[in-house]
């Protein structure tokens, strides 16, 4: 549609006077009206058509009050249907609104008088607060106000949650090594393995590679060892990307009973770090990094039942894992202060494995099914800047 730019003409020889611009009739069909000066008044005697977009200049005064350009429509012609106006306030954002966003939007909405048309009025997201949208009915009353999550704050939360999920998955990623040692008792010593995979959390997609090394030593029915691993991941979000890293090292031990019973214990220290490049809905880029550390402990009990006269076995298992990922405080590239709560995870697992061991005990294959429950794993982040939170 066409665009109309009502222009303020100032008398350079005297004080500036913002006069009212007026039209007798406006047929608006997906057109745009740009009112570029806060306090500017535009009057339309008769409005018809399907509606369009109103970009209205607005500002927050020194006394904290909001003001915006004004549009006054005398009569709305709804013969062909009710016109709808999409009003965008420009020059302010959601950080400029008071805590009572409904009252602030009602104050702004009073500047756009178009009884007989419906309106959707929007204040764009700020550095901290999400976009605020008010629905205005045909009587000119605000019928609903909704606040959306800030796009960057939401993505930071997703990155933090993804780091936690990686942390939780590595609280006990020693099960394969422990299983190998139960299957091949003389295989203790130096070892290494590499893993590649993908994960999804809400709208975040992560591709990662893990390198894990370790060494262990058997003493009778006991086995002790140490391990270290490094995970490098690339996160893709709707409004940006992240480079995610996880480092951990740990000690592990196992008791292997002569009757097939076993107890595995793993203690680890973890460190996570993410560098991110994100974009607000207005197109502004923000970058930065977050990092934190954590500790985990897992204890697993099970028993391997060899099926007589075969190379197959069944292995019921029960495991309890506890992890604590420390709180984190950091500042984004545009000065938003983030406080991330510590996350506690208490995971219980019941499972059963069915497997096959080669007669020479040089190889094996198995399948495993488990039921898990996490009694903790709640997290939250708080954002603040210049008194806005």
Label each PLM-derived region with a short phrase:
Residues 98-113, 206-222, 337-345:
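Short secondary-structure subsegments characteristic of cysteine-rich extracellular domains
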């Amino acid at each position: 549609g066409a665009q109309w730019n009502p222009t303020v003409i100032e008398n350079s020889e005297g004080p500036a006077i913002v006069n009212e611009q007026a039209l007798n009739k406006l047929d608006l069909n997906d057109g745009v009206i740009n009112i570029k000066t806060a306090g500017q008044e535009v009057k339309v005697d008769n409005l018809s058509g399907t509606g369009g977009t109103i970009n209205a200049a607005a500002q927050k005064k020194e006394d904290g009050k909001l003001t915006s350009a004004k549009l006054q429509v005398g009569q709305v012609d709804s013969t062909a249907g009710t016109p709808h106006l999409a009003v965008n306030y420009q020059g302010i954002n959601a950080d400029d609104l008071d805590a009572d966003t409904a009252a602030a939007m009602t104050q702004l909405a009073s500047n756009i008088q178009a009884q007989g048309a419906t309106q959707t009025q929007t204040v764009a997201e700020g550095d901290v607060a999400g976009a605020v949208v008010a629905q205005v009915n045909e009587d000119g009353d605000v019928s609903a106000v909704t606040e959306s999550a800030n796009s960057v704050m939401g993505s930071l939360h997703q990155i933090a949650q993804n780091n936690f999920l990686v942390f939780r998955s590595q609280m006990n990623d020693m099960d394969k090594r422990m299983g190998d040692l139960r299957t091949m008792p003389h295989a203790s010593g130096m070892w290494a393995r590499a893993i590649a995979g993908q994960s999804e959390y809400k709208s975040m997609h992560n591709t990662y590679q893990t390198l894990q090394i370790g060494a262990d030593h058997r003493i009778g029915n006991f086995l002790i060892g140490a391990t270290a691993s490094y995970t490098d991941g690339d996160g893709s979000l709707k409004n940006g990307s992240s480079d995610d890293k996880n480092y951990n090292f740990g000690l592990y031990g196992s008791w292997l009973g002569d009757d097939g019973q076993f107890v595995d214990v793993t203690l680890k220290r973890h460190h996570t770090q993410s560098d991110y490049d994100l974009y607000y809905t207005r197109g502004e880029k923000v970058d930065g990094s977050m990092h934190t550390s954590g500790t985990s402990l897992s204890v697993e009990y099970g028993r391997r039942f060899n099926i007589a006269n075969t190379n197959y076995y069944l292995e019921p298992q029960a495991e309890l894992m506890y992890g604590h990922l420390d709180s984190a405080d950091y500042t984004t590239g545009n000065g938003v202060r983030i406080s991330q709560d510590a996350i506690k995870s208490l995971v219980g697992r019941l499972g059963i494995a069915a497997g096959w061991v080669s007669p020479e005990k040089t190889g094996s294959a198995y399948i495993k099914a488990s039921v898990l429950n996490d009694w903790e794993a709640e997290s939250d982040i708080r954002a603040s800047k210049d008194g806005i939170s």
